[in-house]
Amino acid sequence: MGIKGLNALINEHSPKAFRNGEMKTFFGRKVAIDASMCLYQFLIAVRQQDGQQLANEEGETTSHLMGFFYRTIRMVGYGIKPCYVFDGKPPVLKGGELEKRLKRREEAEKQRLDMKETGTLADIAKFERRTVRVTREQNDQAKKLLELMGIPYVDAPCEAEAQCAELAKGGKVYAAASEDMDTLCYETPYLLRHMTTAEARKLPVTEIDYAKVMEGLEMELPQFIDLCILLGCDYCETIKGVGPVTAFKLIKEHGSIEKVVEAIENNPKSKQKIPENWPYNEARELFLHPEVIPASECELEWKEPDEEALVDYMVRQHGFSEQRIRDGASKLRKSLKTGTQGRLDKFFVVKKRPAEEKKGKNTKEEKPKKKRK
């Protein structure tokens, strides 16, 4: 879910941290992508005209496979080398948030069934999107597809966005790509948003520079993490009555959650309520010391797609068009070869042009000589 209100807060205090650009501007970059986020995104967005998910003749959902296949080809076509990272086991602290999500899905499912009786197709589709959940089988199917496409993936021991950030910090990739703003809490040098959004939506890829975020907020990592916990994260609830503006003000004034709590408890006029048995310190530790595979132990290799195996998997097993799968495999193969070209900024240091020498007041410009007739 990310951090509530963080994007707007950074935009206000660190506007220079944002850079919007077309996908092609990341030519030659390796990017670690939150695959678990992609799975939800594809299952929600990749639909038929009637709003139903794509499915094969057996009724098995294939929206996620189509999403991974074509969005990956699109990125590689722009010279980007994607590496996908899948979620592992969720932290114990996240149990409360996951339970809330389950209840929301159950409520949406009830509303969806009611809508089938009285609602329009648009109404039914809206509630169907809210009931989406990713199964273990869909995870495994996506991994199998990526393997056949020659695209590397990593199974994170815990949170996918933390592992993406670790790969970026360790120099294995340029940036972490996720819609979750809490990826910044794991110190990714760069966070890319809208990387896997449908091309039809025409959303620019947003690059967020971690160093510039810290510079604009005038914070170090511990204060930033405490700010994010106050704003609201997946690991614990926050202080009632504290919104983004107040949270920022409190951290700037007191420097840590401990001192914020102390100030609130010592102020009899305060209307803010500290949650009972608030595990903010445990949440902080999850951000400061996430469970990840060290980047040095991750070997990422991009290979040629196995076209025949892809056809067998996508066409014979999942009902896709053979011609489209072969065309996609061909495009992927050509793009991977093109993508081996490096970025020019890896080889050259761009220097500013020297300023033109200022002409002194007493210096006379030489006039062009007149031609003799």
UniProtKB/Swiss-Prot annotation:
Gene Ontology CC: mitochondrion; nucleolus; nucleoplasm
Processing after translation: Phosphorylated. Phosphorylation upon DNA damage induces relocalization to the nuclear plasma.
EC number annotated for this UniProt entry: 3.1.-.-
Region (Disordered): 347-373
Binding locations of Mg(2+) 1: D34, D87, E159, E161
Root EC class: hydrolase
Residues annotated for Mg(2+) 2 binding in this entry: D180, D182, D234
Cofactor(s) the protein needs: Mg(2+)
SMART domains in the cross-refs: HhH2 (SM00279), XPGI (SM00484), XPGN (SM00485)
Annotated DNA binding sites: R47, R71, E159, G232, D234
A GO biological-process term: base-excision repair
Cofactor detail note: Binds 2 magnesium ions per subunit. They probably participate in the reaction catalyzed by the enzyme. May bind an additional third magnesium ion after substrate binding.
Region annotated Interaction with PCNA, chain positions: 340-348
InterPro entries xref list: 5-3_exonuclease_C_sf, Flap_endonuc, HhH2, PIN-like_dom_sf, XPG-I_dom, XPG/Rad2, XPG_CS, XPG_DNA_repair_N
MF GO annotations: 5'-3' exonuclease activity; 5'-flap endonuclease activity; DNA binding; magnesium ion binding
Entry's family note: Belongs to the XPG/RAD2 endonuclease family. FEN1 subfamily.
Subunit-structure text: Interacts with PCNA. Three molecules of FEN1 bind to one PCNA trimer with each molecule binding to one PCNA monomer. PCNA stimulates the nuclease activity without altering cleavage specificity.
Entry protein name: Flap endonuclease 1
Species assigned in the record: Komagataella phaffii (strain GS115 / ATCC 20864)
